Structure formats: structure tokens, C-alpha cells
Amino acid sequence: MAMSLASQIKLWWNTQNSPTEHSSIPLLKARLSQTWLNKWTIGLLLVSIKLWMFKMSLSGQLDGAESNSERSCSALERSVSKMMSIPHYTATGMNHVIATAIQKFVSGLIKMVLLIITGVQELLIFAVNMLISTYTCLITLVVQGAVSLAVDTSKHVISFVNDTISTVVPEIEKGLNGLADGLNTATNAFVDLGNLITGKQAEEYTGQIDFVKLQLDGLKNVSIPASVNEKLDSVKDKVPDFETVKNEIESLIRKPFQTISKSMNETLATPLNVSDSLKVPALKSAQFCKDANIPEVYAKLNSGLNTGLKVIISLLLILALIMIVPVAWSEWRLWRYHEELWVEQSTVDVKQEKRHAFHTVLFQAQHKYVTMVKQKLAWGKKLYQRNLSQWYWAYILYPYMLTLLLVGLFGILAFLLQLGLLSILKSGLQSLTVPTSEVGADVTETVVREIETWKNDTNLFLNSQETHINKNLLGWVVDSTSTVNTTLSTFIDTMNNGIDSVFKDTPLHGAVQGVTKCLVTLKLQKVADGMGWVSDNAHVTLPRIDKELMSHQDIEQEASEKADYVSDGIARIIKTVEKLLFTELYIALACLGIWLFMCLIALVYVLIKSRDRTTNFEPSRELKFDMVDTSRDINVPRVLPPQITIPKPALFMRNHIPSPATDPFEEYPIRRNKSSSWLFNLKSPVLRKS
């Protein structure tokens, strides 16, 4: 019964690779079972483990960074909240300063105004009293002197007039009587003439014509009475002393000042609640940590690292598994090559083979791919040059050198892959830095807005306080100066009325009025002008808060610096990890550097040997060991050995394996397994014997 394909393969595997009592080395089956432990797969696995350890290190640092970031963000929120509340704290302090300054200013202003009012009041009263007293005395003396002169003059005039009248009246009376008789005679003549013309009798004109009777009886009794001197004496006694005016003016002057003093004292006793009127910006609270979602960001970072690690390790594991295939294929080819080599060596006189050629064969068997590379990359036209170039490539790709090269290459690969994981962390960092990068601008905007609002409100308050001071406090000064001016006008009018009441219609009226105007009225008008100037300038201007004084550049800079605290934690981690990665890169590059240094030494050696004609290589002889006897001289004509074809047993059929008696491999002791060469029968080498 024919065997199935699986059974045939199993039979072949067991017969070709099962250990026997004649075999002490691992055969093909054992060797293939270790192909997964090849240097490529192990290197990739080590790189995967390194990446996993790198990720675990990053995860641990990220956990610490998350905790630090949350604490730093909370501290940053508190710090930024305080910075955003700078207008509140500034306004609180400034409002206290402004309120205290205004209170002290108003209190000092009231006290100063009270002192000024008291001083001005007493000065005005003193000036008015001085003027009134001085010019009252002056007017009194002038009037008394004038009246005394007038009285003395009037006495002499009265005495002269009285004496003259008593002497002249009789003589005048005689003349007047004669004149009256003449006039009456003329009147009778006119009556007679009329009677003649009209025919009336004299009796008919009785009652119609009055006759002249001139008498000086009244003049006899005329005399200037002595009462005229009495009236002049009374004028002297009636000269005003202006005591009433003085008292009235003093009362009028004191009244407004007393009112102002009373109001100011009441204001001074009542403290100003300026602080309650000043506005204070509210405290601000920054809450960007909640918007930053720090745990979520770090979770995304860890998730990204895990995903990247899984992808990279999966690719490395797949590549490691894939590398098993060419290694297994290479191992199988090496086994086959050993079998072919054994067949070849069975036809060669080993004793006559050169030692170097045999080592060349062993090297080609053990390092097949290196042999392929050195044959492909060999240079030179002469044999010794090609041998030297092949030696160079074999030297720099020898296992020890190749191990150093692979360590450097795997180190660079690990560096690049770890750098890829780190780039994932860097990209995730952007989502954490975006919320905090705007903190500086937000803080500046909030501070500027709140300070601007506070500045406007405070300036409005200062405007109102300025108006209040000018209207209520200094308004009293304006009112008092106006009252003083009114009082002075009243005083001047009262004084003029007093002068008019005494000297009106007298010769002294103009003189007294002129003296009063010159010496009193003009002085008081100057005082009134001074009071008017005080009224015009009795106001204050409080300074305003300027926006330029509230600089926010330092605030913006400090806020921007504090806004980087959270992201700086990850940035420091990245910087530290990058430093470690570059240290690994430097180690890998150092390995490559050593390998390149050895390559350079080998190259120098080859160049030196290529110039040396006394090499061990003989240009007249070729060293070939490609299934041909290399012991013969190249100048001797080649004699082909008889060709022996190895019998081809039936595939996978144990019962068709040649018997030991007919098996051509049986005579060689090195042949342990008679059935081990059947697999190569499809391409069995041609054995040549010289």
C-alpha cells in the first residue's frame, strides 16, 4: 500500500535526522530546531524588550509627571488667580490711599479754611473799625470846626443886621409915607378925570379903587433870631460817630463767617465714608486646569505610547519570525553543502591537498553568504589582488567583526524606534501646552480690562469728590466772599446814607462825601476786589489716575513664564529621555566606529600587501577548490577522472536504499548515515579522480 505524502515526509525526517549510536553531533533536525535563536531574531527580540523597557520607563515618568503637573497646575491656578486679582489688591490699596488722602485733605482744608475765615473775619472787622474810627474822628473834627466857625460868623451877622434894621426903619417909613401921599393924590386925579369923562360921581367908585398905604410896622419888628446859632450848634452835636454803622457792619461781617464756621465744624465732626464710594474689582479665579484635562491628556499619551509600542513590537516580532525562514533555509543549505563537500572530499587525496585550500573550503562552508559577498565585491585583475580583496571582505565580515557591526546597527535601530515613541509623546505634548500657552494673554487681558474699569470708576469718583469739595467746602468760601462783598457794599451805602442825612443840602456835603470816598470807599472797594479774586480761585483740581501709570508688561511676562510650568514637566522628561537615547546612539556609533576603524586597518593592510610582490600567493598557480583536485600542476594537462554517478534511490523509500556493500560512501569512515545523501541525488556532484 502506497504511503501518504505526510507519512513519507515524516519517515524522511526521522531517518535523516534521528541520532544513532554513530552520531554525536546535532544533525539537521536539531539544528533547525534552534534556528529561531539566530542572531537576527534574538537582536530584534532584544530591541523589542528594550522598547518595552523604554516604554515602561516613560510610563513611570509620565505618572510622576502627571502628579507633578496636577500639583503644578493647581499652584499655577492659584498664582494666576492672584495675578488676575492684581486689580482687586491694587484697587484695595489704592482706594485706601485715595480715601485717606481725601479725608486728610478735606480735614486739613476745612481747618485751613476755618483759620482763613477767622483771620479774614477779624481782619475785615479790624479794617472796618479802623477806617470807621479814623474817618469818624476826621469827619467829626472837620464838621465841628466848620460849625464853630459858622456859629461865630452868624452871631456877628445877626447883631449887625438887628442894629441896622432898628436904625433904618424910621427913615424908610418917612419916605414911604410921602410916597404913599403922592400915589393917593394921583389916584384922586385919575378918579376925577374918570368922573368927568363918564359922568359918575366920586361915591360910585367907592370899593373899586384902593388907595396906597405904605407902612413899615412889620419891618420894625424884623430881627435875626438867636435860634440860628442854636441850630448850628445842633448840627455840630449831630455829626455822626458811625457807631451804629460799625456795629451793624460788624454784625453783618460776622454772620456769614459764623454760619460757615458752624457748617465746617459739623462737616469736620462727621467722618467721610470715601472708601464705601470707591469701587473695587472682584477677585478672579483661573480654572484652566479643568479645561486642560491633564489626566485625559496623560491617558492619551500613555495610550499613544502603548499603541505605538504594540505596533512597533508587532512589526519587530513579525520580522523576527520572518528572519527564522532565511536562517532555516541557510542552515539547510549549509547542511546540504556539507554533504556535497563530504562527497567531494571522498575523491580527493587529502594528504596532497594544501592546508590553505582546505581552510578555504571550510570557510566557504561555514560562511556561505560572506563568501558570496566577497566574491561579488572582489576587485583586481590579478589573482593575488582578487584574493586580497576577498580576504578583506571576509575579514571585516568575520563573526567577531560582524557581531560588532550588528550591535551598532541594532543600537541605531533601537534608537530610531525609541525616538519614534518619543515623537508620539512630543505630539501629545501639544494638547497639554495649548491651554496653558494662552494663560499669559488671558491674564494680561483680564488685568488690563479690570484696571481700566477701576481707573474709570476711580476717576469718576475723583470728579465727584472734586465737585463736592469745590461746591460744598470751597463753595462756602465763595459764599463768604460774596457775603463780604455784599456787606462792604451795604457798609458803603449805610455810610453814605449817614453822611447824606447829616450834610445833605449843606456846604459840607460835597467835602465830607469826597473825603469819605477817597479815604474809605476806595479802600473797601479794593478789599471787595480781593474777595472777588478769592471767589474766582477758590477751587481745587484733584489728580487723575493715568492708564500709562498702570504698566502690565511685567504681568504679561510673568504670566507667560508661569504658564509654562505644566508643560515644562513633560519637556524635562523628554529632554532627559532624549539625552539617554543619544547616549545609546553614541554607544552604537562607537561600535560602528570601532568596526570602521578595523575596516580601515584591514584596508591599509590589503593595500600594503598589494604592493608587496613577495606574497605567499603564487601567481602561476590558482587555488581552486570547486570540486577539482587542486594538488596537480596547472601546466600539466588535465586528465578527467572517470565519472561515477551515485545511484539514485527511490525517494523516501527505505527499502530502495543501496546496501552497504554496493554503497560507494560506505568505504569512508566519516560516513555515518548511509541514507543521508539521498536528498542530494537530484543534483549529485560529479566526482573527479586524477
UniProtKB/Swiss-Prot annotation:
Keywords: Cell membrane, Conjugation, Glycoprotein, Membrane, Transmembrane, Transmembrane helix
InterPro entries in the record: PRM1
Transmembrane domains' residue ranges: 40-60, 112-132, 309-329, 404-424, 587-607
GO biological process: plasma membrane fusion involved in cytogamy
Intrachain S-S bonds: none
GO cellular component, one term: plasma membrane
Residues carrying covalently attached carbohydrate according to the record: N162, N221, N265, N273, N456, N485
UniProt topological domain (Cytoplasmic) ranges: 61-111, 330-403, 608-690
Subcellular location: Cell membrane
UniProt topological domain (Extracellular) ranges: 1-39, 133-308, 425-586
Membrane topology annotation: Multi-pass membrane protein
Function: Involved in cell fusion during mating by stabilizing the plasma membrane fusion event.
Family (UniProt): Belongs to the PRM1 family.
PANTHER family: PLASMA MEMBRANE FUSION PROTEIN PRM1
Name under which the protein is recorded: Plasma membrane fusion protein PRM1
Organism of provenance: Yarrowia lipolytica (strain CLIB 122 / E 150) (Yeast)
Gene expressing this chain: PRM1
